[in-house]
């Protein structure tokens, strides 16, 4: 494969780097705007890989695969996270056959979209505020959505995710082995219209009478924690094998206040509350037990020489860590 270098921002020390893979050729871009520059040069179906570090956000108008080094704020196998700073939109033209995939990023600002997009995937990413409209067959795997999730005229599947304040409007959502949270700001469990929940743990606000799921939901093998009147399932017509619990009986390290280092591991008692498939409820059960480690190799270091050699060559040292 060929490697070409964008010389706009090269440094003697370790650099931010985005690599663009297009038809077998790899192009590297450097600096905080590397993601923006790589996206401008990309075509539908291309892949952009980001190193650890903080990149400026850019609107996504192409169905690309965007991969980061990971979402965690602490190190995973000595790999720091990839952070994207600033709001961005997803506006991909209708009818594009390629699919959008976003994996291994930390983005705490707002992602919004109202384009008709099918098959988008969000994997192993920590997201702040997400607002999607007209998304079909979108999927979220091993994600943490820590502020809110708005869905309008969309259908999405969530596997082994933490989702705060989810509000689907004219949407159909399926949640498998997820943790869903009502943080008490007026949006929460009562807004989960037409949702199907399997093997999930629902966190309510004890002081709020709005913690009950709407009657349009179907619920299988789920547990409600800290819910008003001891039940969030009261109005649900189909609610099979549901439990009620409190924080200390359910989680080892979570008491209702989110922080990045909380594992959401269950207590020994809670591990006995099995889902429909015989595994534990929550994010560590099911067919896809939660694991924040990304599936792609990580760019862990990029050193670029300050000067070229006498024959015009520029020394570039890129270190890539494979998945263990």
What are these regions (language model features)?
Residues 102, 108-114, 127-260:
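Predominantly extracellular beta-rich ligand-binding scaffolds that present long acidic/polar faces
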Residues 18-56:
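Acidic Gly/Asp/Thr-rich repetitive segments characteristic of extracellular carbohydrate-active
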Residues 65-113, 126:
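Right-handed parallel beta-helix/beta-spiral solenoid domain characteristic of secreted/periplasmic
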Residues 1-16:
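Bacterial Sec-dependent N-terminal signal peptides
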Residues 238-293:
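C-terminal accessory segments
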Residues 53-54, 69-73, 224, 228-229, ...:
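Acidic glycine-/aspartate-rich tracts in secreted/extracellular proteins
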Residues 44-65, 69-75:
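N-terminal extracellular ligand-recognition/capping segment immediately after the signal peptide
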Residues 279-314, 321:
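Short, compositionally biased P/S/T/A/G/V-rich stretches that sit at domain boundaries
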């Amino acid at each position: 494969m060929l490697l070409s270098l964008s010389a706009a921002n090269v440094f003697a020390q370790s650099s931010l780097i985005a690599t663009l893979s297009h038809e077998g050729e790899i192009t590297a871009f450097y600096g905080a705007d590397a993601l923006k520059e790589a996206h401008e040069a990309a075509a539908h179906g291309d892949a952009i890989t980001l190193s650890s570090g903080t990149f400026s956000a850019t609107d996504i108008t192409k169905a690309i695969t965007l991969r980061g080094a990971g979402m965690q704020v602490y190190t995973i196998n000595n790999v720091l996270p990839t952070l994207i700073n600033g709001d961005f939109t997803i506006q991909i033209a209708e009818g594009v056959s390629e699919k959008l995939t976003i994996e291994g990023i930390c983005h705490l600002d707002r992602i919004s979209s109202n384009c008709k997009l099918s098959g988008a995937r969000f994997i192993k990413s920590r997201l702040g505020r997400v607002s999607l409209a007209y998304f079909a067959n979108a999927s979220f795997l091993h994600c943490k959505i820590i502020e809110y999730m708005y869905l309008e005229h969309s259908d999405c599947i969530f596997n082994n995710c933490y989702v705060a304040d989810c509000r689907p409007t004219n949407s159909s959502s399926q949640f498998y082995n997820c943790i869903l949270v009502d943080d008490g700001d007026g949006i929460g469990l009562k807004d989960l219209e037409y949702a199907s929940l399997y093997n999930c743990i629902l966190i309510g606000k004890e002081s709020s009478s709005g913690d009950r799921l709407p009657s349009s939901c179907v619920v299988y093998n789920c547990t409600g924690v800290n819910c008003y009147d001891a039940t969030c399932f009261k109005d649900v017509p189909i609610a099979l094998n549901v439990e009620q619990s409190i924080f200390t009986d359910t989680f080892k390290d979570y008491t209702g206040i989110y922080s990045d280092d909380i594992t959401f591991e269950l207590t020994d008692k809670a591990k006995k509350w099995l889902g429909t498939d015989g595994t534990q409820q929550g994010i560590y059960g099911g067919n896809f037990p939660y694991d924040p480690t990304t599936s792609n190799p990580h760019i862990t270091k990029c050193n670029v020489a300050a000067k070229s050699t006498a024959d015009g060559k520029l020394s570039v040292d890129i270190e890539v860590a494979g998945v263990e």
